[in-house]
Design a protein with these regions (language model features):
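Bacterial N-terminal signal peptides
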Residues: 8-19
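Conserved, mostly hydrophobic/aromatic
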Residues: 38, 85, 157, 223, ...
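Acidic (Asp/Glu)-rich catalytic clusters
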Residues: 49-55, 72-84, 101-114, 148-149, ...
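Catalytic domains of cell-wall/extracellular-matrix polysaccharide-remodeling enzymes
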Residues: 130-210, 214-216
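C-terminal domain-boundary segment and adjacent tail
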Residues: 185-188, 244-300
């Protein structure tokens, strides 16, 4: 005959199992923020963003206002109020044979550019250069002015390739700009950061789904995504900073990777995962509405 202690332990375990199951089924749903980067890079990225926007799902996009195709992105985004807009602050130009420079022009910020007036290719090269912090602030402010006068509502900023936040001094510049324009800074809301950037092309969707299945409750789970339609203009893009984006023989794979991430965003599996797990998709505009824009990470 079972002892009283055994019966008590069994009852406690059964109660715990029921409580855990109830929490998983009826507790606070996981919160996920989808941030799609590099908007305005080219036509193929812009058309991919529009395809995702047409699904109606809420998500955030980071527009690069120093990029050649930002104006097309602006006009497209005005048609899709479900899309929240931020600024991808740019201090680098990473592609081979496809370059850009500062909004202010090379003569206004000479310490930020190479000999022909383009941004430097990598974060390391930028940090090793003799950049002037005052020029950094003026250029990033010019990018923000272009963004805020575009007709789009801007709610946050982030850093292309991490460069604008790579040192405490650079971060302080961005914080001043964010406060000036009353916007938040991505990853300053206590987000759990995730990406499928380095996932194999044929595993982008499955890696995203597996990651969402592990989403932390009580936290904002940030997923940084890079989408594009695979087109001739994308097929020739060679990433000079990330070997995983090119084959071992030097063939560019960027187009395949970004098409894979677009496929993941448009997949039936993603839609079913969001519905089945009651995932709450949020944007930075919603995070700001909770307590104002955040420009500094929360203290642990």
């Amino acid at each position: 005959m079972p002892s009283f202690r055994t019966l008590t332990l069994t009852l406690c375990l059964a109660t715990l199992a029921v409580s855990t199951r109830a929490m998983s089924q009826g507790g606070t749903p996981p919160e996920v923020l989808l941030r799609l980067d590099d908007v305005g890079m080219n036509h193929s990225v812009n058309t991919a963003i529009e395809r995702v926007a047409r699904t109606g799902m809420p998500f955030s996009v980071s527009v690069m206002f120093a990029y050649p195709w930002y104006q097309e992105a602006v006009e497209m985004l005005k048609k899709h109020p479900n899309v929240n807009v931020g600024v991808h602050l740019v201090l680098n130009s990473e592609w081979r044979n496809y370059r850009w420079g500062p909004v202010l022009g090379k003569t206004a910020v000479p310490s930020l550019v190479d000999s022909v007036g383009y941004f430097l290719p990598s974060t390391r090269e930028f940090l090793d250069s003799k950049y002037d912090l005052g020029e950094v602030e003026r250029e990033l402010d010019a990018q923000m002015q272009r963004a805020t006068t575009s007709g789009l509502k801007i709610t946050y900023v982030d850093f292309h390739m991490g460069t604008a936040g790579a040192t405490p001094q650079l971060r302080a510049v961005v914080e001043r700009i964010a406060e000036k324009y009353r916007v938040g800074i991505s990853r300053s809301y206590g987000e759990v950061s995730n990406t499928i950037f380095s996932a194999p092309v044929d595993q982008k969707t499955s890696e995203l789904i597996k990651g969402l299945a592990r989403a932390e409750r009580g936290r904002t789970n940030l997923w940084v995504i890079h989408v594009a339609e695979r087109t001739p203009e994308m097929d020739v893009l060679f990433d000079r900073n990330n070997a995983a984006q090119n084959s071992g023989t030097g063939v560019p794979l960027v187009a395949q990777h970004r098409q894979g991430e677009l496929d993941a965003m448009l997949s039936r599996e993603l839609a079913e995962m969001v519905k089945a797990n009651r995932i709450k998709l949020v944007t930075y505009e919603q995070l700001n509405a909770r307590g104002g824009p955040r420009v500094r990470p929360p203290v642990p």
